Swiss-Prot record:
This is UV-damage endonuclease. It comes from Neurospora crassa (strain ATCC 24698 / 74-OR23-1A / CBS 708.71 / DSM 1257 / FGSC 987). Keywords: DNA damage, DNA excision, DNA repair, Endonuclease, Hydrolase, Nuclease. One of its GO terms (cellular component) is nucleus. Residues 568-579 have a biased composition (Basic residues). Belongs to the uve1/UvsE family. Coiled coil: none annotated. Residues 13-32 have a biased composition (Low complexity). GO terms for molecular function: endonuclease activity. Residues 583-595, 647-656 have a biased composition (Acidic residues). It comes from the Eukaryota. Residues 1-82, 119-146, 175-194, 241-264, 492-515, 550-620, 636-656 are annotated as: Disordered.
Amino acid sequence: MPSRKSKAAALDTPQSESSTFSSTLDSSAPSPARNLRRSGRNILQPSSEKDRDHEKRSGEELAGRMMGKDANGHCLREGKEQEEGVKMAIEGLARMERRLQRATKRQKKQLEEDGIPVPSVVSRFPTAPYHHKSTNAEEREAKEPVLKTHSKDVEREAEIGVDDVVKMEPAATNIIEPEDAQDAAERGAARPPAVNSSYLPLPWKGRLGYACLNTYLRNAKPPIFSSRTCRMASIVDHRHPLQFEDEPEHHLKNKPDKSKEPQDELGHKFVQELGLANARDIVKMLCWNEKYGIRFLRLSSEMFPFASHPVHGYKLAPFASEVLAEAGRVAAELGHRLTTHPGQFTQLGSPRKEVVESAIRDLEYHDELLSLLKLPEQQNRDAVMIIHMGGQFGDKAATLERFKRNYARLSQSCKNRLVLENDDVGWTVHDLLPVCEELNIPMVLDYHHHNICFDPAHLREGTLDISDPKLQERIANTWKRKGIKQKMHYSEPCDGAVTPRDRRKHRPRVMTLPPCPPDMDLMIEAKDKEQAVFELMRTFKLPGFEKINDMVPYDRDDENRPAPPVKAPKKKKGGKRKRTTDEEAAEPEEVDTAADDVKDAPEGPKEVPEEERAMGGPYNRVYWPLGCEEWLKPKKREVKKGKVPEEVEDEGEFDG
């Protein structure tokens, strides 16, 4: 059997290496046929049938070696011979790669000698359209790189049999526009500076509010919030009865038994119980807000999970009527305003029928939720549903027409509550105001969204131009015509955000008030929720700021905590010995002393009544500084790792 070196030498002979492209080195030889590859390179084909057969045999031999077979197709013996075959295959592939690289260089040189223009960058898709963004014809001629294709070259390609002539057009994926050459962050930072108003709505007479979640109550034990939810799979699983139906559910010891017959009413009951727990906590949130001067709250859209789902959806009445009516009664007594904000997928202007149907179901669900609160007439009128127009779908005018048609399909109760909001992507105040005036829909102004998405033909970035009295009057009239108290939204971008994408993210807390009327209902959209409202109240000394005090880090005195365990008296150490008569007489005194030790044990914390739980305690300690959200939870115990004795470490090194 020939050795590995002899085979490698045979594969690396000049004849085998140059067999494929030997004709290219002979200038007197006729130019071989060229076929266009996908990459745009013209690779010369073998001109000799003998060379093609040799290449085929070499490839088959390499493939056989990789599969453990020899040139005749017989299986090689395992062991050293098979290992040598793998190494030979790897070496052969490396040589093939080197030959391909050399052939490419020769082919490129041949094309240059033939006078065929070679583009420096060849697109994978040479026919991709190229659209330049120049403002006039002169700039376009000066900036566009033009690679002309000579007619002689086209005729030459036709003669040699090329099917598709490569047009040397600059590819859209490889040409960098002058406008796009600048980094996105630099473009954002280089935009015209914002022009802000110096007006502050002081003294403040309006209502400040936050959205959905109270961070202080959410971290109470047990937590108080109204957005408990579940997965769709949980609803499906809970259609099966529990393993032990007479015992309460447990995530490990008593789970739904999928071997039992499913019942749809059990799945509905599971998700409805979540909704009822959410609705019950509204009362606690309203009482907490009243104590600290907050009388404006946005209810969570996730209060009743999957209520608008096409399959697992359900009506809120009658199972939630009583709980929601109780929440509405408390809100009416305290004079609080409640609103909702359906999600971003609620789009009446979508061209997709299923999206529109889902949006209508979602709006009907929110309307039923607000109606079951049974609020007084004016408060019920002020309980609005705010939505965005959504996507533009390539044509703003067509989207607006679809919105008008689908708006007409809503029930009158939904129409009475629907409000449009300008967004930070594509719909400006000037886009929405005409349709709001036409359809008698109130428009809520979001200052933060306006600073990102506005019409430069009418306004500049900032709060000054948007505060124009004529424009503000048009916005206010959309509310007055329906007798609804106007509201606005305010938030600020995070520090260091310059691109539109980064600027959309809300800062944890806002630093100032917008130039709105001093009696406005202002929704503060910030990550820190009620703490952002507290920050404004403290900064501008708004009514109620004196009630708010700082928390004690990691300690809350408004929760019931378990009493500390009573330590048993320590027994005196000593060996057994015979007692004397005097010691036996003193024995009763020792017993009394031990009993006194038990009586003097520290008392546990006083029990906090349910109505005072998580309300801030006697000193109203509910404020946590910016970035100190961990104060809301008990401090984590630090586990100190004991040192391992050196003897043990030494023994471990020699364990086998």
